[in-house]
Amino acid sequence: QPKPTTSLDFLKQFNVSKTAKIIDIGGGDSYLVDNLLEMGYQNITVLDISEAALDKAKQRLGMKASKVKWIVADAADFKPTEKYDFWHDRAAFHFLTRDSEVESYIDTVQQSMCPHGILIIGTFSTNGPKKCSGIDIRQYSEESMVAQLKKYFHKVKCFTIDHITPSGATQNYIFCSFRKM
């Protein structure tokens, strides 16, 4: 999506400061980073398991790429060295299918977020696909997402949307926003 409206709407909803530390987990070559830079955000980190995807985004951004911190890592194993105000995860969390991976990831998120930070997670819903790019995923409902995160985060809002893929397929996502307690 050239303009990831759902994700950008969260930034507006929470009135995220242009100097806030933002991390995009699984950002790869998505256009969120382009939009963040265009909107004047100054502390952006993009993490993805695929160096090739990050390289594609860097090439697309040209000189602007130097304004972004790029991290090649598996979200399940990532151990940040700084704290974030806004943690964005669109379609990385659902690849964590083992309970131990999910628990480790949630621990990392809560340890790496500033007090009252905002967490956005978008995954395939229980009405969405069971696989992504041929890989098994874990589907979520509002209830199951909240149950995973309620120890450290207060739910602000959840909703489902249909995403149309480039091939024309419809994928149902659930997006939830949380505030760190």
Label every PLM stretch briefly:
Residues 111-114:
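Short, conserved loop/helix-junction motifs that constitute active-site signature segments
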Residues 1-82, 96-108, 118-181:
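Class I (Rossmann-like) S-adenosyl-L-methionine-dependent methyltransferase catalytic domain
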Residues 88:
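A conserved beta-strand element that flanks and buttresses the S-adenosyl-L-methionine
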Residues 91-95:
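Short catalytic micro-motifs in class I SAM-dependent methyltransferases
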